Amino acid sequence: MSASVPATASADPLTRYEAVVGVEVHCQLRTASKMFCACSTDHDGAAPNSHVCPVCLGLPGALPVINRRAVELVLMTGLAIDAATPAATRWDRKNYFYPDLPKGYQISQYDLPLASAGRLTVETGDGPVTIGITRAHLEEDTAKLVHATTPDGRKVSLVDYNRSGTPLMEIVTDPDIRTAEQARRYAEELQLLLRTIGASDADMERGQLRVEANVSLRPRGADAFGTRVEVKNMNSFRSVERAIDFEIVRQAAALDAGETLRMETRGWSDDRGETYHMRSKETSDDYRYFPDPDLPPLHVAADWLAGLRAEVPELPAARRARYEADLGLSPYDARVLAADPDATALFEATLAADPSMTAKAVANWVTGEYLRLRNVASPGAAVHVHAAELAAIIRSVEAGDISRANGKEVLAAHATSGAAAVDLIAERGFRQISDRTALAEAVDRVVAAHPAAVADYRAGKQQAVGFLVGQVMKATRGQANAAMVQETVRERLDAQP
């Protein structure tokens, strides 16, 4: 059938069918060198084929050496998802032929993964859902194909082997996911977990996190699985949800029309908003897995695993729960903070710098102004905020020494210059006038200079108060305490006959 969904397709096929979805995630591990050689993984922007050696080029006689840190990061991920760890594992060759695979096989793990039988609980619109994780295993990445056109118009495909051999972790769920939203939430939570434990930067835009989905439908109440279709090329979390939603509707329309679905791999087109046929789906038998004779089995000692367990930090779900239960934060603030490791670190450090401040006050500044500064910063620009300086700014605002608007300006200046908050406040003359006598004199001058506004107030126009307050703030170059100014203006207006 056509990739396009018929107009007659049911708007809600899940009333007749149950979707069965499994998600496979490949993430690039945060290591300095490749999986089986010493070549650097920092090849963004590097000249093609400049980070290569005989091992990652697959040259005859070159022997692989295991990257210990890559193994540790997968073991830590297994601990974070409450998975089982084997006493020993091994490496297998996954055989297939493609230009981006220099050896003609990929070193992976087949039946003895480093982690198995894990789980991850995610929050959805219908409440928490626990998704089983079948396995997490190590493998090496392929090279990158670059498709180009020569000056004389010929279509060519070029191979850049800089990426070849980069350590990857593949994480495969059980077929526990029932909606596209659940799949998206799972991918988002997994990205956060990987970043929190330091396993991966997991940046989808840079190809460090790749999500694939296996989607099938079965009639409501049936036990047997339907025909599985793999969906690739989903380059954002929104794409994950859109692609799975589309595939559910497409398969339902085909089944309703009496068609037989085929096992295939389909790509997702963000522009067209639909999936398209790529190739027939391979099975594990097609890859002819067998143990790699160049790599010995790997034994996971209990003391090694215990040391890695101590490295695993507080996980996002536990952190959200603590922020709500112990610090009294709203679910929104807890979620936003826990979703950003840098924001979490700044929040925690600022509270530690001044325990007298409320968690809510600090959360407001971190989730509001700090994240805003990060979002508006130019690409590659550094936004560094020191916890002690943020604490000083918050104290100054809450004490009424500076206005909140000026506090935001001080924070922005500190983030780019690193200057101390107290010096920035002094340089800019932001210290608020809170002396009641001085404020009263400024208010009296403004009230006397604007009799029309006074008359408007007498006539019941409350906006006149705002006008007069604004004039006082202008006259004091924004240094007056706005709350005290408003209070004094009302006192003066109400006291006049």
Task: Show where each model-derived region lies.
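Strongly charged, low-complexity linkers/loops
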Residues: 381-395, 401-475
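Extended, non-catalytic structural segments that build the interaction scaffolds
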Residues: 304-311, 318, 349-357, 390-402
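Basic, nucleic-acid-interacting segments
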Residues: 2-314, 325, 331, 353-356, ...
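Core structural elements
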Residues: 206-219, 287-288, 324-348, 359-376, ...
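Extended hydrophobic-aromatic, low-complexity segments
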Residues: 298-299, 334, 346-349, 358-361, ...
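Structural motif
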Residues: 15, 328, 352-362, 399-402, ...
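C-terminal non-catalytic interaction appendages of large macromolecular assemblies
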Residues: 161-166, 204-211, 220-221, 432-497
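Amphipathic alpha-helical segments in well-ordered regions
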Residues: 77, 247, 365, 369-373, ...
